[in-house]
Regions:
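C-terminal beta-strand-rich structural cap/linker in extracellular carbohydrate-active enzymes
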Residues: 393-414
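Conserved alpha/beta catalytic core and glycan-binding cleft of carbohydrate-active enzymes
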Residues: 16-17, 22-53, 129-277
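Acidic/aromatic-lined carbohydrate-recognition and catalytic surfaces
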Residues: 1-88, 99, 106, 110-158
Length: 414
């Protein structure tokens, strides 16, 4: 099917059981009291950050007076990516997988390469991006930098292809806030427009990487409660999938899987079947809580035309049928947007379309008088896609479009 495969690559840290760390630890334990480590005797001692003094984010090396940097957990010591020898190791690792046919990497925890220094982290990413793209410009790099939007925008200067767009993700992100009524519908469209300049100033060739949830976040189905929760879950997925760039979808979001609290719950196994003994089913992480899913399993949702699964399939189909959605530039249409409805255009190489969305529980009418999309008036625009979470459908009367609750309309030139 032409599916490209990328692998998760954690360059920030290794396991404390890794031979590099084990050899460094044994060497430090063997040093006479007061002696300084010598990398000519053990090169691996410079693969990590060791210190005689405790610092925040450091753990004590058992049986010694030494401490080592371990930002996430004492079982995951941080690597010294400013060490050329460590860089050569990761070039060999990249070679191994790229030569095997992998198409790129998701780079984990890039803001912790040198904690607190965006400048140093950008330099490290520049080295790796140059190396990977030097092997093949089509090799793809997307980075996880869980911080504010202004900061992760700066990482585009490194030449990596994509940064995960955290501003729209998680229960406090733009999408969930809009769908919960904590933010206006216009904030979705307006932020899509403004972030383009924010990223392009660092890399004009950037490719956005929208996502809604990941393995460290609560499942999106848990963001909503009440009688409209299924509709909100559906449309939240649509707002993610209709962003431009390379969109990422965490497994199980297309089912409305449940999972929050500790990490094990967020990583519950795919809900293939309600029969726990069915093929493909597994028990999940040992420390995962015992909880029931909010919505049906995949095998049940496949048979239900109104399920979250079939809704998400429809959104993806609309996206794939209209490449301008992924590739185009967004323009926010303030005149035609409001608290409960957004209007935006997406344009790419002479192709243009209009996205209208109602993020509320009530029908909303929008008068598009005066609007032209690529030279086509509102009345002449043709239907390219319609996404409904209920039985009601949109109505068009001249320049007036009435959108039912939690719905999206995609219109374009004939």
């Amino acid at each position: 099917r032409g599916i490209r495969v990328i692998l998760d690559l954690a360059m920030n840290h290794s396991s404390s059981s890794h031979p590099w760390f084990q050899q460094a630890a044994e060497y430090l334990k063997s040093l006479p009291e007061g002696a300084e480590p010598d990398s000519s005797e053990c090169p691996y001692v410079d693969y990590y950050h060791f210190s005689r003094e405790y610092q925040g984010g450091y753990a004590q090396l058992d049986g010694t007076a030494w401490y080592y940097e371990a930002r996430f957990w004492d079982g995951m010591p941080d690597l010294n990516l400013e060490n050329e020898a460590v860089r050569r190791e990761f070039e060999q690792i990249a070679d191994f997988w790229l030569d095997m046919g992998v198409d790129g990497f998701r780079l984990d925890a890039v803001k912790e390469y040198v904690t607190g220094s965006t400048e140093d982290n950008v330099e490290i990413l520049s080295w790796f991006a140059d190396y990977v793209h030097g092997k093949d410009p089509e090799n793809y790099l997307v980075c996880e930098c869980w911080t504010d939007q202004n900061t992760y925008a700066k990482y585009y200067e490194s030449g990596v292809d994509s940064m995960f767009d955290f501003a729209f993700a998680d229960k406090s992100g733009i999408i969930a806030n809009v769908m919960n009524g904590k933010a206006s519908a216009t904030s979705y469209a307006k932020n899509l427009e403004t972030e383009q300049g924010m990223y392009a100033q660092y890399n004009p060739d950037y490719i956005n990487a929208p996502f809604y949830t990941n393995h460290d976040m609560g499942r999106s189905a848990g963001y909503y409660a009440g009688e409209n929760s299924e509709a909100q879950t559906k449309m939240g997925n649509a707002l993610n999938l209709l962003m431009n760039g390379n969109v990422f979808l965490y497994y199980g979001e297309e089912l409305g899987m449940k999972g929050s609290g500790k990490d094990e719950n967020k990583r519950a196994p795919m809900y293939w079947s309600k029969d726990g003994n069915a093929e493909g089913m597994c028990k999940g992480p040992a420390d995962m809580d015992d909880f029931r899913m909010k919505f049906d399993s995949l095998e049940e949702q496949q048979e239900d035309p109104d399920s979250i699964y079939n809704y998400v399939k429809q959104v993806i189909r609309v996206r794939n049928q209209n490449p301008v959605i992924a590739r185009g530039t967004t323009a926010y249409l303030e005149q035609y947007s409001g608290e409960q409805c957004f209007a935006l255009t997406r344009s790419y190489e002479g192709s243009n379309l209009l996205l209208l969305g109602n993020t509320s529980a009530e029908a909303v009418s929008v008068d598009l008088t005066g609007l032209t999309v690529g030279g086509t008036t509102a009345e002449e625009l043709v239907l390219l896609g319609e996404l409904y979470t209920g039985e009601e459908t949109a109505e068009r009367a001249g320049t007036v479009v009435t959108l039912p609750a939690y719905s999206i309309l995609i219109l374009g030139e004939e």
